[in-house]
């Protein structure tokens, strides 16, 4: 059976070296995590699979790695300075602080009904309730207290402050002087670096529409209440595509990317039953979006967003371009008085300039890792009554592809053979190959089941020509154990390379 709780996954991640709390020896930094020896391999494998699919295997995509430090004007004209904020509320009794919409989602139905009545919101729509509360914050704080809104930390009704907005961007200063002129931000998303480089990429590659720019990188959001392990954190990684299309073709390409991304996640090992496409209703759409479909996943803590695919129209390039009036921008954008470049596309047939629409598939790397771990976690009862935990990861994503294990660690002939074999398998370029000489083959198998290693190769007495029957007929053969079935076969080392290539290459 899969993980019964998020705590079960967290325990496995720490015990086996996937993910650690950052700065743990100093009490930890809330909402920040470090990837350990196995976690970094899993995360890198996921990113490489995404890059291979979306850049190498396509003829309409270019890559980019934009800087984390972001010019203030980029985030001013994108709208982040004014709108990148979440509603926040405090409990005066416990001194705890919560994001308002998350807090309300956790309330009993009778509490919410009292709030709807108090805020005069007729339709029981949580989004509409939050909007009404933010428009009348003083009234909302009193209504929350009167309605008996519960504090998740104590389980008791709270004494709530008026809700207010909190901008989630991390500020910093570039250079030795901390003044308004040197203000910059750690980027809250990777997308803006793509938009401001649109003309650079277009000029360098001579791309024709439709085409995309792909990027994987860190982003930073000062979340009010980071929670659920690596699901909602303050430092995270994104895999984003900005796919530029002609106006009028945007709805087709939006549908295309929703299906493409759903298919890819299934190919990574997530079951279709756990992936739920969710079409955002108009009241939930971001200010820039014409349409957004979220791919939700059934995490141990609930159904939550794994990836979003948004039709951003011409908002982004229209926000950052010069000559806005001449380009017929359809989205509502700030008047740009600073941009030095025209971020537009010239139709090769008509010679007319226009601002392309953008389709954005945006996935969280950390959420992807969490989904893979949750999906793969399996607790099995064995025929002998014992129990094992196995991570049934897609073999190509597994942190360790092959474990090479000498049957005993006190026979140099066996250990040296195993080391040579490890080097030979590593040269295949299939990923990490681990040599392990713990001396207890049974415990080694269980340990590698738990971290998802698809194949364990054992070097024994037969391998070095010292079979119990006194023959050398099994010389240069090894035992190969399958993680999922626990079945073992014997292969000649010359056959082993082809066997592993067939099962571990993309």
UniProtKB/Swiss-Prot annotation:
Substrate binds at residues 99, 189, 236-240, 360-364. GO terms for biological process: glycyl-tRNA aminoacylation. Its main location: cytoplasm. Keywords: Aminoacyl-tRNA synthetase, ATP-binding, Cytoplasm, Ligase, Nucleotide-binding, Protein biosynthesis. It catalyses: tRNA(Gly) + glycine + ATP = glycyl-tRNA(Gly) + AMP + diphosphate. One of its GO terms (cellular component) is glycine-tRNA ligase complex. Pfam families: HGTP_anticodon, tRNA-synt_2b. It is found in: Cytoplasm. It is an enzyme of class 6 (ligase). InterPro entries: aa-tRNA-synt_IIb, aa-tRNA-synth_II, aa-tRNA-synth_II/BPL/LPL, Anticodon-bd, Anticodon-bd_dom_sf, Gly-tRNA_synthase/POLG2, Gly_tRNA_ligase_bac, GlyRS-like_core. Its EC number is 6.1.1.14. Catalyzes the attachment of glycine to tRNA(Gly). Homodimer. Belongs to the class-II aminoacyl-tRNA synthetase family. NCBIfam families: glyS_dimeric (TIGR00389), PRK04173.1 (NF003211). This is Glycine--tRNA ligase. The gene is glyQS.
């Amino acid at each position: 059976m899969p993980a019964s709780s998020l705590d079960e996954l967290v325990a496995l991640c720490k015990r086996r070296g996937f993910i650690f709390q950052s700065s743990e020896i100093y009490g930890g930094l809330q909402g920040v995590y470090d990837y350990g020896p196995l976690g970094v391999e899993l995360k890198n494998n996921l990113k490489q699979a995404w890059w291979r699919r979306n850049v190498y295997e396509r003829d309409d995509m270019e890559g980019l790695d934009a800087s984390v430090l972001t010019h203030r004007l980029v985030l001013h004209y994108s709208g982040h300075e004014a709108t990148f904020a979440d509603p926040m509320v405090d409990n005066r009794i416990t001194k705890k602080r919560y994001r308002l919409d998350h807090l309300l989602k956790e309330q009993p139905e009778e509490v919410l009904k009292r709030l709807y009545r108090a805020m005069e919101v007729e339709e029981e729509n949580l989004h509409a309730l939050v909007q009404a509360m933010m428009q009348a914050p003083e009234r909302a704080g009193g209504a929350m207290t009167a309605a008996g809104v519960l504090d998740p930390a104590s389980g008791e009704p709270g004494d709530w402050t008026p809700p207010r907005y909190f901008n989630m961007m991390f500020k910093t200063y570039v250079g030795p002087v901390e003044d308004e002129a040197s203000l910059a931000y750690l980027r809250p998303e990777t997308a803006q670096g793509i938009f401001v480089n649109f003309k650079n990429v277009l000029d360098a590659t001579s791309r024709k529409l439709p085409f995309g720019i792909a990027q994987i990188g860190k982003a930073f959001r000062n979340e009010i209440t980071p929670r659920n392990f690596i699901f909602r954190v303050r430092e995270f990684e994104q895999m984003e595509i900005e796919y530029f299309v002609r106006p009028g073709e945007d709805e087709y390409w939006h549908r295309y990317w929703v299906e493409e991304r759903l298919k890819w996640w299934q190919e990574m090992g997530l079951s279709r039953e756990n992936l739920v496409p969710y079409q955002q209703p108009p009241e939930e759409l971001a200010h820039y979006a014409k349409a957004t479909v979220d791919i939700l996943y059934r995490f141990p803590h609930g159904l939550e967003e794994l990836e979003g695919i948004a039709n951003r129209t011409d908002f982004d390039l229209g926000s950052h371009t010069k000559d806005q009036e001449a380009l017929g921008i359809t989205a509502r954008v700030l008047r740009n008085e600073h941009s030095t470049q025209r971020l537009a596309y010239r139709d090769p047939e008509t010679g007319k300039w226009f601002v392309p629409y953008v389709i954005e598939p945006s996935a969280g790397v950390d959420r992807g890792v969490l989904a893979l771990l949750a999906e793969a976690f399996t607790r099995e009862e064995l025929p002998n009554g014992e129990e094992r935990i196995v991570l049934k990861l897609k073999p190509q994503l597994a942190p360790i592809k092959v474990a090479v294990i000498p049957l005993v660690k006190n026979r140099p002939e066996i250990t040296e053979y195993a080391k040579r074999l490890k080097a030979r398998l590593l040269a295949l370029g299939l990923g990490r190959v681990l040599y392990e000489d713990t001396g207890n083959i049974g415990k080694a198998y269980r340990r590698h089941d738990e971290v998802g290693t698809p194949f364990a190769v054992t070097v024994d007495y037969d391998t070095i020509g010292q079979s119990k029957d006194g023959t050398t007929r099994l010389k240069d053969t090894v035992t190969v154990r399958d993680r999922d079935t626990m079945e073992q076969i014997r292969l000649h080392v010359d056959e082993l390379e082809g066997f592993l290539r067939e099962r571990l290459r993309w």
